[in-house]
């Protein structure tokens, strides 16, 4: 039985999305990395994506934001997210890697080792084992799915609403010889095409924040999870220190939402309530950002070179410093001027920079967490 528990959602149109993907991205999904792919876009399609995405944000500052504007973004959550990743995926790969998430850091731990450990920790908390059938909700270009597949031996299905990311994920899985252990499916996670009780376990890493409501996405995950199965999530949430009457707090939240394709970010208390209201039994919940780690989770975005752990990390993090971003964004603007880069590249990069600044501010002031861990079980039948 396939019957989404949600109603009033955007209508899916896979042919439309496939046609747009071809027009904008062409064969760039086969490119070696983010920079190489960035310059192989269809200009008219990219401009359409820029216009469609930024219509929700341009000239709409936090002090004047209305409930109607937030509701409009929620109503178009799928289009908002799809076009965000049409614009941002190559920049993510260039600046961060193929696992689009934050992590905790130990002293002396290289950046990419810390990223992998964060993925392993979630798999361990859920209890993912060899031979399990597992769903990755909002899989990006498949970095976490590949790592968890290798770590556990499970078969992982990645679900994603962006054709380009699906193509990138499939390409990388083939290159690593993991095609038999991984598959990637195009679809809206609010209305999944999978039958009820399909998966032994489900996880989501910083992806369900794109849902219009957390109860809606968690209810859909509950539906496709087998009775007795476990769901684990690293959720993006405003902490309960967030005060919506405080303009600075609202500016931080809106900056994160705009720069990260989010229609409506909730507070921790709302996230916990959504798990319970969806029918799950909560096994564990904790803000991992509150752990007394030697290095803060946001240090790479802050561009604080004093935290660099290895020589290799220096070349990753230097791009995130203020002057590193200034040079990169200036170059993007120059390339646009000479029509060597598609229009909208610099505007997208500037929006990501706004998000980075607001993420750091939210982290430092304990207003935001990208790693609120919730592990919950669907009751056995």
UniProtKB/Swiss-Prot annotation:
It comes from Gibberella zeae (strain ATCC MYA-4620 / CBS 123657 / FGSC 9075 / NRRL 31084 / PH-1) (Wheat head blight fungus). Pfam families: Methyltransf_11, Sterol_MT_C. The keyword Flavoprotein does not apply. The lineage of its organism: Eukaryota, Fungi, Dikarya, Ascomycota, Pezizomycotina. This is Sterol 24-C-methyltransferase ERG6A. PANTHER family: HYPOTHETICAL LOC100005854, ZGC:194242. Sterol 24-C-methyltransferase; part of the third module of ergosterol biosynthesis pathway that includes the late steps of the pathway. The third module or late pathway involves the ergosterol synthesis itself through consecutive reactions that mainly occur in the endoplasmic reticulum (ER) membrane. Firstly, the squalene synthase ERG9 catalyzes the condensation of 2 farnesyl pyrophosphate moieties to form squalene, which is the precursor of all steroids. The gene is FG02783.1. Belongs to the class I-like SAM-binding methyltransferase superfamily. Erg6/SMT family. Induction: Expression is positively regulated by the FgSR transcription factor that targets gene promoters containing 2 conserved CGAA repeat sequences. Keywords: Lipid biosynthesis, Lipid metabolism, Methyltransferase, S-adenosyl-L-methionine, Steroid biosynthesis, Steroid metabolism, Sterol biosynthesis, Sterol metabolism, Transferase. Pathway: Steroid metabolism; ergosterol biosynthesis. In Fusarium, the biosynthesis pathway of the sterol precursors leading to the prevalent sterol ergosterol differs from yeast. The ringsystem of lanosterol in S.cerevisiae is firstly demethylised in three enzymatic steps leading to the intermediate zymosterol and secondly a methyl group is added to zymosterol by the sterol 24-C-methyltransferase to form fecosterol. In Fusarium, lanosterol is firstly transmethylated by the sterol 24-C-methyltransferase leading to the intermediate eburicol and secondly demethylated in three steps to form fecosterol. One of its GO terms (molecular function) is sterol 24-C-methyltransferase activity. One of its GO terms (cellular component) is endoplasmic reticulum.
């Amino acid at each position: 039985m396939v019957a989404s528990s949600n109603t009033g959602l955007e209508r899916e149109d896979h042919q439309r999305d496939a046609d747009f993907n071809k027009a904008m991205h062409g064969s760039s999904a086969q490119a070696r990395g983010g920079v190489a792919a960035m310059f192989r876009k269809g200009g008219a399609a990219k401009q359409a994506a820029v216009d469609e995405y930024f219509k929700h944000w341009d000239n709409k500052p936090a002090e004047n934001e209305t409930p109607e504007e937030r509701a409009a973004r929620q109503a178009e959550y799928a289009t908002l997210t799809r076009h965000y990743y049409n614009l941002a995926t190559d920049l993510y790969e260039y600046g961060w890697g193929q696992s689009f998430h934050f992590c905790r850091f130990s002293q002396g731990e290289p950046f990419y080792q810390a990223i992998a450990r964060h993925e392993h920790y979630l798999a361990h908390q859920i209890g993912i084992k060899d031979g399990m059938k597992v769903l990755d909700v909002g899989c990006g270009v498949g970095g976490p799915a590949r790592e968890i597949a290798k770590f556990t031996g499970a078969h992982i299905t990645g679900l994603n609403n962006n054709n380009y990311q699906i193509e990138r994920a499939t390409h990388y899985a083939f290159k690593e010889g993991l095609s038999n252990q991984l598959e990637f499916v195009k679809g809206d996670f609010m209305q999944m095409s999978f039958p009820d009780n399909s998966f032994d376990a489900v996880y989501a890493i910083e992806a369900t924040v794109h849902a219009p409501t957390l109860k809606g996405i968690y209810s859909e995950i509950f539906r496709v999870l087998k009775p007795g199965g476990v769901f684990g999530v690293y959720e993006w949430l405003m902490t309960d220190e967030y005060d919506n009457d405080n303009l600075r707090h609202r500016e931080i939240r809106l900056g994160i939402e705009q720069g990260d394709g989010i229609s409506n970010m909730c507070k921790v208390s709302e996230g916990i309530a959504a798990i319970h209201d969806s029918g799950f039994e909560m096994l564990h919940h904790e803000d991992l950002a509150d752990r007394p780690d030697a290095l803060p989770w946001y240090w790479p975005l802050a561009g604080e070179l004093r935290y660099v752990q290895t020589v290799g990390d220096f070349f990753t993090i230097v791009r995130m410093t203020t002057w590193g971003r200034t040079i990169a964004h200036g170059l993007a603007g120059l390339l646009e001027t000479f029509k060597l880069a598609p229009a909208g590249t610099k505007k997208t990069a500037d929006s990501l920079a706004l998000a980075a600044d607001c993420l750091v501010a939210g982290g430092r002031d304990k207003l935001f967490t990208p790693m609120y861990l919730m592990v919950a079980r669907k009751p056995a039948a």
